[in-house]
Each structure stands twice: as C-alpha cells, then as structure tokens.
C-alpha cells in the first residue's frame, strides 16, 4: 500500500515472505482501499521483519497477548517512533490473533 500511495495509483510490488501475511503483497486492481487510504492516512511508518518480531514478542511478554504479524506491524511502527508520541495519548488498533504454530515458532525462536 505504501508504494501505491506514493505512486498515487495501483502498481505491482514485489511480495516477500513475512510474519505479517495480512499486509503482504500488493493492492488488487479496482480495490477501494487505495482511495480510502489516500483520504485518511497522513503518514506511513515502514518497519522490517526484525521490528515486527520484536513487537510481537513485546506484546506477548508485556501484555500476555498473542497477536498475528499484522497487529505486530502497528505496534512496531509505534515502538519505532515512540519518542515523538511522548506526553500524547495514543491508541493502537490491535486486531488479529490469527497466527499459526509455524509463524509463532519463528517469532519465539
């Protein structure tokens, strides 16, 4: 989505293995999500696999919640930029606990 928003149109992007299956891949032609995102998103924060894994482990250890990779992306983005949110109220939408045992093994190994 990030690359499509930069291009202001749907483009093909490379797809790589990730802990965040729900955010993998590109945007389908004709999808309404690009226009919605362009209307409502001011900024995006990119995170890598190590940051997603760290966020998932943080959530397991600190909050005793098992989350999937897509929720880990949101938490990783916050952790990456947390200094800029000091003194502010922040809400992070954590949706999804749909993680298979193999992905969980990758996270905790």
Which residues make up each language-model segment?
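Glycine-rich phosphate/pyrophosphate-binding loop at beta-loop-alpha junctions
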Residues: 1-39, 85-109
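Active-site-adjacent helical/loop segments in soluble small-molecule enzymes
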Residues: 30-87
